[in-house]
From Swiss-Prot:
Similarity field: Belongs to the sea anemone sodium channel inhibitory toxin family. Type I subfamily.
Keywords: Cardiotoxin, Disulfide bond, Ion channel impairing toxin, Nematocyst, Neurotoxin, Secreted, Toxin, Voltage-gated sodium channel impairing toxin
Function, as annotated: Binds voltage-dependently at site 3 of sodium channels (Nav) and inhibits the inactivation of the activated channels, thereby blocking neuronal transmission. Possesses the highest efficacy for the insect sodium channel para/tipE (EC(50)=5.5 nM), and has effect on Nav1.2/SCN2A (in complex with SCN1B), Nav1.4/SCN4A (in complex with SCN1B) and Nav1.5/SCN5A (in complex with SCN1B). Also interacts with sodium channels in cardiac cells. Shows lethality to crabs.
Taxonomic superkingdom: Eukaryota
Major location category of this protein: secreted
The keyword Disulfide bond is annotated on this UniProt entry: yes
Subcellular location field: Secreted; Nematocyst
Site (Important for toxicity): N16
A single BP term in Gene Ontology: regulation of signal transduction
Name the record gives this protein: Delta-actitoxin-Bgr2a
SS bond list: C4-C45, C6-C35, C28-C46
Transmembrane region(s): none
Keyword Secreted: yes
Amino acid sequence: GASCRCDSDGPTSRGNTLTGTLWLIGRCPSGWHNCRGSGPFIGYCCKQ
């Protein structure tokens, strides 16, 4: 899937490593968690 920015990645996506995986269908899979607290985005930003 596409990469997305977790809260722990820093305030901007420029020059930072995107450690999350964008999950569009439903919630994050089992064993993963949503690593994005807030913001206008589609789906969930999931991380193992």
